[in-house]
Structures are given as C-alpha cells and as structure tokens.
C-alpha cells in the first residue's frame, strides 16, 4: 500500500542572504520523512510566480514569511492530509487549484513549492530511493556540466560591472569530479590574478568575486587570464558563460551600460553580443536581452543561435506558456529552470520536458538567496539536464549542491556519464 501524507509542518528559516524563507517537513503514514527549503532571487522576472512576504516592516524589514508558513500549516495541511505521496502530479494540481490564481498569489509560490518538494523527498524516502532515482528510475544518468559564477556584477554585487554573472564551464572534463576540480582551480587562480591587480577579493551573493573593473570586457579578460594561469585552455578545456541579466539594464526601450557610457537599442545590443562571441570563447549567454524584447531575442537567435546557447531566465520564468511561445517563435534555444519561479515540482519537470522535446537545453539553477537544500542537484541528474548553475565553488549553500553531485556520481559509478560538449545539444 502506498504511503499517504500524515502531517506537514512549515517554519520560517533564513536563506544565505539572511532573509526569511519557507521550510517544510512532511511525515508519511509509514514514518518516512521529507524536508525542503525554498530559495529566493535578487533579480526576479516580472512574470514569476509570487513569493508571499508578510510586508510587516517591524519584522525582517517586511520580508517575513509567516503568512506563507501559515498557509502551509492550515489550508495546505488540511487539503493534503491522507493524500497519496507518490502521486506528485495530482498533489501539485491540487495545490494549484487550492491557490486558484494565475501567479500563485494567494498561497504563495514559496508555500506551494516547499510543500511540493517536501512531499517528493518523503515519497523517495518511503521507497528507499535517492530523490534523483525516485524522479526517474533509469539505467543511465547524465551528470551536469557546472556553470561556476566566479565573477559577480550587477545586482549581485555593488561597484562592479554592468553584467551580473561571468561564469566558467569545464566542458573538457571527463567526469563531474574533474569538472569541479577544474572550476575550483580557476576560481582560486582568479583570486590570485585579482590580488595581483590590487583588486578586492570579497565575494558576492553567489560566492563569486566582485572587483571594481573599469569595463565589462575587463571581466572576461581577467577570467581568461585566470584559466590560463590554472593550466587550462580557454575555448577547449573551459568556456565562458554569461548572465548579463539584461532586464536590469533596460529602461525606456534602451539598454544602458553605465560602465561604458553607452545606451543601445535592441538591435545594437544584439550586435554587441555578436561582437563578444566573435572575440571570446563564449558558449552560453543567459538573458542577453530584456524579458519582453521578443524581437531582439529572435534576432539574436537568428544571428548566433547555432553557435551559442541562448538561455531564457527572466524571459521564460520556468513557465510553459512563455516557453511554448519562445519555441514557436524561435526566440532562443535554451531555458533556465528555477523551481521557485513556477512553484511546483510537476510544472518544473513539464518545462524541462517541453524544452527537450523541442531540441532545446534546460539548465537547472539555484537562486542568489539559497539554503542548504540540495534538491536541484538531484533534479538535474533525474532529468538528465546536462547542465547546472549553482554559484561559485565557495559558500556552503553553493558547495552543498556540488558535494551532493559528487556523491551521486560516486554512487552511480559507471552508470553516470559526464556529457562535456554534448550537453549543448543545439550547437553546431
């Protein structure tokens, strides 16, 4: 007999930025236990599901989550009591119905996601399986190529570049463990290079360095130097990935690059990226344009979509309606997957499957406000996503995910494949 939900208890905990977030514990009728904690973003897409905050300025500057916690402990708890834990789709559909809004504004995506994931963890425990195997009981699994965010700017760091994230991807590694080693060595090499330039080596929200560099190009140049100093070849062993978070640069129909004193039109921004791709070993650009600049996205995809992964984050917000339009209009070739943008596990998996069915890649991602929860590591492996974005190899809320992937790779042995360049399905 399948185990059913016996109890659920949510609480307010802290994320890595010291802001409150929701954690939920689920106990099943057979005694199995599952726990999940929800992350939170700094630069958020306007189309994301609603993260319910209290707005009470006397607590945590209005960022408390007592309302979301209460929604789990009352409305959700009574609705899912006795519910078959292994029926994830039905459970998530029930949560969506209970909420009844298009953007999860009533219960809160944070309340719903904590519930959805905690039940999945409990159901996996009930079957004595790790979460990745419970979600996809397969003979072989693909471990993800990591995107290490080693240099931060934009909203993730003050006094730095216009663009939010400069990342390295160890595409030439033979295993996840080797990829982690390569990325970490480049990270430490970058620290030495920055110190040699008398630059600040304090770290941003995601563990990357946040130096004061005169231009955006300097960020790429300094990373290339760090790759070489670590003994690796840029464009062969290690590639560069970018997340400029361009929606943060967009105002009144133009893109403002403050460090370069430039204001660019959509077409000029596309040409800007084309120029960078010609010059540097860039394999992936996320949110290269504003989240509603559909014409710009289509132009960028036409120009460089056959040689660079173009990832929609704020553009798609893990939402299958927006993704479906993107696929039909050829507006990119990849989607960033963030569980809390949509608010349930089933909807997240549906977005990954939709992308893969279109021949697109799906990059499983953390948020800048994280916890020690490692669900995304299991999700990336379960869905054979091939890529994961979870910060620098620094700060334990980031390394928790990398360490989980090391353990999964070890557990799987010969059944684990590290895809390298094959993770980029759509590049010529």
Curated annotation (Swiss-Prot):
Active site: 206 (proton donor), 338 (proton acceptor)
Cofactor note: Binds a second Mg(2+) ion via substrate during catalysis.
Enzyme Commission designation: 4.2.1.11
One cellular component (GO) term of this entry: extracellular region
Cofactor(s) listed in the protein's UniProt record: Mg(2+)
Record GO biological process: glycolytic process
Entry keyword annotation includes Transcription regulation: no
Protein residues bound to (2R)-2-phosphoglycerate: 164, 338, 367-368, 389
GO molecular function: magnesium ion binding; phosphopyruvate hydratase activity
UniProt cross-references to SUPFAM superfamilies, sorted A to Z: Enolase C-terminal domain-like, Enolase N-terminal domain-like
Cystines in this chain: none
Pathway: Carbohydrate degradation; glycolysis; pyruvate from D-glyceraldehyde 3-phosphate: step 4/5
Keywords of the record: Cytoplasm, Glycolysis, Lyase, Magnesium, Metal-binding, Secreted
Catalyzed reactions per annotation: (2R)-2-phosphoglycerate = phosphoenolpyruvate + H2O
Cellular localisation: Cytoplasm; Secreted; Cell surface
Major location (coarse): cytoplasm
Known role: Catalyzes the reversible conversion of 2-phosphoglycerate (2-PG) into phosphoenolpyruvate (PEP). It is essential for the degradation of carbohydrates via glycolysis.
Family that this chain belongs to: Belongs to the enolase family.
NCBIfam families per the UniProt record, alphabetical: eno
Protein name: Enolase
Organism: Dehalococcoides mccartyi (strain ATCC BAA-2100 / JCM 16839 / KCTC 5957 / BAV1)
């Amino acid at each position: 007999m399948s185990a059913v939900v016996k109890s659920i208890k949510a609480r307010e905990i802290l994320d890595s930025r010291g802001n409150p977030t929701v954690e939920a514990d689920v106990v099943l009728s057979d005694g199995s236990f599952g726990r999940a904690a929800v992350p939170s973003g700094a630069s958020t897409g306007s189309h994301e599901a609603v993260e319910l905050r209290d707005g009470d300025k006397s607590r945590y500057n209005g960022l408390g989550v007592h309302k979301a916690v209460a929604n789990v402990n009352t409305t959700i708890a009574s609705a899912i009591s006795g519910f078959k834990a292994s029926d994830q789709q039905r459970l998530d559909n029930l949560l969506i119905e209970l909420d009844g809004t298009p953007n999860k504004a009533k219960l809160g995506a944070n309340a719903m996601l904590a519930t959805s994931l905690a039940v999945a963890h409990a159901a996996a425990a009930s079957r004595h399986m790790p979460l990745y195997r419970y979600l996809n009981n397969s003979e072989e699994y693909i471990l993800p190529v990591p995107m290490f965010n080693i240099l931060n700017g934009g909203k993730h760091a003050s006094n730095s570049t216009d663009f939010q994230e400069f990342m390295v991807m160890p595409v030439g590694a033979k295993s996840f463990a080797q990829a982690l080693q390569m990325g970490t060595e480049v990270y430490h090499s970058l620290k030495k290079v920055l110190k040699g330039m008398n630059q600040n080596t304090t770290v941003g929200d995601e563990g990357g360095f946040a130096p004061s560099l005169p231009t955006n190009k300097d960020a790429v140049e300094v990373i290339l130097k760090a790759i070489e100093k670590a003994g690796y070849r840029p464009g062969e062993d290690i590639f560069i990935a970018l997340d400029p978070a361009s929606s943060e640069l967009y105002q009144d129909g133009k893109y403002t690059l403050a460090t370069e004193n430039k204001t660019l039109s959509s077409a000029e921004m596309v040409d800007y990226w084309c120029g960078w791709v010609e010059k540097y070993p860039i394999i992936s650009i996320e949110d290269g344009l504003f989240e509603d600049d559909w014409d710009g996205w289509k132009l960028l995809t036409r120009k460089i979509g056959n040689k660079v992964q173009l990832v929609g984050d704020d553009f798609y917000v893990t939402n299958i309606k927006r993704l479906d339009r993107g696929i039909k209009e050829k507006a990119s070739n990849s989607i960033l997957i963030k569980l809390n943008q949509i608010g349930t596990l089933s909807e997240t998996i549906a977005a990954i499957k939709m992308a893969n069915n279109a021949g697109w890649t799906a990059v499983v991602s953390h948020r800048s406000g994280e916890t020690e929860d490692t669900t995304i590591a299991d999700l990336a492996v379960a869905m054979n996503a091939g890529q994961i974005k979870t910060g620098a190899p620094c700060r334990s809320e980031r390394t928790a995910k990398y360490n989980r992937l090391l353990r999964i790779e070890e557990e799987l042995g010969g059944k684990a494949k590290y895809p390298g360049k094959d993770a980029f399905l759509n590049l010529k």
